[in-house]
Amino acid sequence: MPRIDADLKLDFKDVLLRPKRSSLKSRSEVDLERTFTFRNSKQTYSGIPVIVANMDTVGTFEMAVVMSQHAMFTAIHKHYSLDDWKHFAENHPECLQHVAVSSGSGQNDLEKMSLILEAVPQVKFICLDVANGYSEHFVEFVKLVRSKFPEHTIMAGNVVTGEMVEELILSGADIIKVGVGPGSVCTTRTKTGVGYPQLSAVIECADSAHGLKGHIISDGSCTCPGDVAKAFGAGADFVMLGGMFSGHTECAGEVIERNGQKLKLFYGMSSDTAMKKHAGGVAEYRASEGKTVEVPYKGDVENTILDILGGLRSTCTYVGAAKLKELSRRATFIRVTQQHNTVFG
C-alpha cells in the first residue's frame, strides 16, 4: 500500500552551519587528517578523507598521483586494464595506499578485480559500486567479496537509508557509499522518481553505520567547498566528489576548443556516452540515467584541492573544531531560504 513519509528531508542547499565560539587563532591550526580502523577488515588508514569518484573521467591514475601528495584518496575507475595497473604500481608505489580498485557486481568484474589485487597486493581498498545497492544480489556479492578478501577494506553502495547501511556492514562492507541521484551528471531522480535529499541521508546513515562501528561516504550533491564541510558536519567519514574534480588536466580526455573556450568532457557512468564507450550502447530494456556535459577547462587540479582544503579549515575555525574529526560534534545546522548574496551571481 502506498504511503507518504511526511518528515521533511533536507539537502545541503537548505541549510547553513551556525558559527560558534572558537579558541583557534588561525586556519593553519586545523588538522584535517583522520585515522580510521575499519570494522571488518581490521585495517587502519590515515589521510584526509576526501575521495575522487570512481568515474572514468575523474578517477584516473593521474588524479591519484596528485591526490596522494595531499594524503587524499582516489577510487580508480574500473575500466583500466591489468597492465595499466601494473604500470601504475611500478611507477607510483607511493600512491597505492591511497587508492581503491573499483568493481561492479558481475562475475567478469570479480575476476578482473581479483587479478588486479593479486598483481598489486599493496592496494588494500576495494570499491564495489552499483547504482542500486538495495538488491539481494548485491548483498550476496558483498558477502562473496568479503570471503575472498578478508583483509581488504570494502567500500560498497549506493544506498540512502539506515537499514540498508546496516545490512551491507553486517554482510562484510566497511564503508558504505551514501547517495542516490544527487550527482551533478546523474539523472536518476528525473528518470525514475527515486532518491533522497543528501543531508538527511548522510545524517541518518551515519547514525546507523556508527552504531555498528562502520563508516560512510557521502557521495554526490556537493557543488562547492561549503557543501563538503556540510557533509562532514552531518556525520560523513569520507566525502566523494566527481563534478568538483572534473575539467582538470589530470582528468581523462583531450581538451576541446570551441569558440575560443577550452573545455573537457564529463559524463555520468549511466549516461549514453559511458554505455556506448564501455557496453556498446544503451540496452533496450533500460534508460540512460546520466548526462554528458562540457566543463570549462580548469587547469591543474592542485588549485582545486587547495580551495577545498582551505574551505574545510575555515569551516572548522568558524565552528570551533580544532580537528576535522570534531566537526560533526560542533555542527549545528540552521534552515535557510537563501545561501548567499546573488547580486553578482
Curated annotation (Swiss-Prot):
The modification Phosphoserine is found at residue 28. The keyword Oxidoreductase applies. CDD domains: IMPDH. It comes from the Eukaryota. Its EC number is 1.7.1.7. NADP(+) binds at residues 26-27, 78, 129-131, 180-181, 269, 285-286, 314-317. Keywords: Metal-binding, NADP, Oxidoreductase, Phosphoprotein, Potassium, Purine metabolism. GO terms for cellular component: GMP reductase complex. GO terms for biological process: purine nucleobase metabolic process; purine nucleotide metabolic process. Pfam families: IMPDH. InterPro entries: Aldolase_TIM (IPR013785), GMP_reductase (IPR050139), GMPR (IPR005993), IMP_DH/GMP_Rdtase_CS (IPR015875), IMP_DH_GMPRt (IPR001093). K(+) binds at residues 181, 183, 186, 189. Belongs to the IMPDH/GMPR family. GuaC type 1 subfamily. Homotetramer. This is GMP reductase 1. It comes from Rattus norvegicus (Rat). The lineage of its organism: Eukaryota, Metazoa, Chordata, Craniata, Vertebrata.
